[in-house]
Amino acid sequence: MNRKYYFNNMWWGWVTGGYMLYMSWDYEFKYRLLFWCISLCGMVLYPVAKWYIEDTALKFTRPDFWNSGFFADTPGKMGLLAVYTGTVFILSLPLSMIYILSVIIKRLSVR
């Protein structure tokens, strides 16, 4: 992942995180502060998780698979993209931590 990829994909993380914060702003619930902290982390780590999911998916499939069949440009694809964006946002914190730990372990094992 490079800086250009991060900045091109960070907007969806900010939009999704902003929506989550906006929807929970007026509600009082027990873990509100924790929810806000996780949402803020998700906003920042969204591009890392998206890259990790795409990289993992492309290890098992070819790029042309994602442009044909079920994933062709149809109205149903928009719903699938919304579910994908939500899933990446929810998984951004755990996947980013897994990615960061794997990079650290690889670098330490090379030495």
From Swiss-Prot:
Swiss-Prot/TrEMBL keywords: Bacteriocin immunity, Cell membrane, Membrane, Plasmid, Transmembrane, Transmembrane helix
Bilayer disposition of the protein: Multi-pass membrane protein
A Gene Ontology biological process term: bacteriocin immunity
GO MF: toxic substance binding
TM segment ranges: 33-53, 85-105
Keyword Membrane: yes
GO terms under cellular component: plasma membrane
One Pfam family cited in the UniProt record for this chain: Microcin
InterPro entries associated with the record: Microcin
Function of the molecule: This protein is able to protect a cell, which harbors the plasmid ColIa-CA53 encoding colicin Ia, against colicin Ia.
Protein name (record): Colicin-Ia immunity protein
